[in-house]
Each structure stands twice: as C-alpha cells, then as structure tokens.
C-alpha cells in the first residue's frame, strides 16, 4: 500500500534535476517509474512494449541486482503477485508488476517499418532476451538502457549506476530511520549497508559524502 501511495503521489516537479548532469539520484521507486514513463511517452513508438526490456532492467537495478544478475534473471522469478529478488518475494506497485508480467509472457513486439512487422523474441528461460539472443551480455544490456535514456537526451539519467545507487541509498535511509544502531563511521557496517567493500578509507569517505548528498536532496 505504501508503494502504491508513493507511486500515485509523484509528480514531475518532484524530480530533482541538475541542469548540467540530469538527475543525480532518485528518491524512490515511484520517481523512477515516472521518469521511465515520461521517456516512453515521447518515443512515438508504434509498440511501447519495446521498452519493457530496458524498464525492467532499471527496476531490477533499483532493487540492488548486479548487471550479471539482471542478464541471468529467470522468468520463473516473476510471480503473479510479486517478484523474487535474491530469494525473497518482493511486492511491487501494480503498474510496475504488470510490466514485469507482460515481459515474462511476451513473445515479441511490433515494429513499424514498411508496414507493421512482428519481432519475435528468441525462446529463453531468461527474462531479459531479444529477437536475436536468448541471453544478452552486459554491453548489450547497457545498449538497451541507453536507447531509453536518449529519448529525452539523458535528462533523467536513466542509467544502471545512477539507479542502482539510488535504490541502495533509499534502503539505507529506511534502515537509518528504523535502527538505533546505524553507524556509517564503521567501515564494516557501511559496507553491508551500501553493498560494496568500503575498507578503503577514501572510498568509505566518498560513499558517505554521496549518501549525505542524497539525503540533502530529498529529506
């Protein structure tokens, strides 16, 4: 219910945009969804389900999956009432879950060339597949995402790294609000919270600085 209300309440004005570099961070999943939908609307594409692939890639990035995990993500982990993320069922806002289910069940998409043609996906157990490949590599995945990002000239920074980091910071902030033992000065604790090795003092300091910027933007 909380996810649904977040999704319903987000407006374009909520997006924090730096004019020189686009969106630096996303506050929540609703904000990310809004940016993706805005981008797809300007595409004037004959079949908007063409963009289900990059959209799902970015939603999985938000939930903390690595690029390798995303390209190997199995269709069977998309359930009718949620998505299995790292072995746990995760509830999704209705609109986003519909995109996951649509991609899971899709046989391909329509494209307007000389007339309308149907591009069939190669059969695969993987959720992320194309008309040529039952499994794609990370470079191809980045290309799919970039196709979506360029629709609005990168204004929304729809890139894996931006969204992956935003999701981590969002969950870190939830934890900080709920926990009395939240101490980012401890490198081991910070490494667990930010899902990376922060034993290096330089990296540790930089990540805390980034997290503080995220909080200044949104809270």
How would you name each of these model-derived features?
Residues 34-65:
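Basic, Lys/Arg- and aromatic-enriched nucleic-acid-binding interface segment
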Residues 18-25, 122-144:
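An acidic intrinsically disordered interaction segment
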Residues 86-131:
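Basic, alpha-helical nucleic-acid-contacting "clamp/cap" segments
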């Amino acid at each position: 219910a909380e996810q649904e209300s977040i999704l319903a309440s987000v407006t374009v004005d909520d997006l924090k945009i730096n004019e020189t570099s686009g969106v630096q961070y996303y506050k929540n999943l609703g904000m990310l969804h809004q940016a993706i939908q805005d981008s797809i609307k300007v595409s004037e594409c004959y079949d908007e389900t063409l963009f289900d692939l990059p959209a799902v890639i970015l939603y999985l990035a938000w939930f903390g999956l690595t690029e390798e995990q995303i390209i190997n993500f199995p269709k069977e982990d998309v359930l009718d009432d949620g998505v299995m993320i790292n072995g746990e069922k995760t509830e999704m806002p209705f609109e986003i879950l519909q995109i996951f289910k649509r991609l899971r069940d899709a046989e391909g998409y329509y494209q307007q060339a000389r007339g309308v043609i149907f591009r069939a996906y190669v059969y695969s157990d993987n959720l992320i597949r194309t008309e040529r490949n039952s499994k794609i590599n990370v470079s191809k995945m980045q290309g799919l995402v970039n196709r979506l990002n360029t629709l609005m000239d990168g204004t929304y920074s729809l890139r894996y790294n931006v969204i992956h980091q935003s999701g981590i910071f969002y969950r870190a902030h939830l934890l900080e609000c709920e926990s009395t033992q939240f101490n980012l000065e401890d490198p081991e604790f910070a490494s667990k919270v930010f899902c990376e090795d922060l034993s290096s003092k330089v990296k540790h300091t930089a990540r805390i600085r980034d997290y503080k910027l995220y909080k200044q933007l949104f809270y």
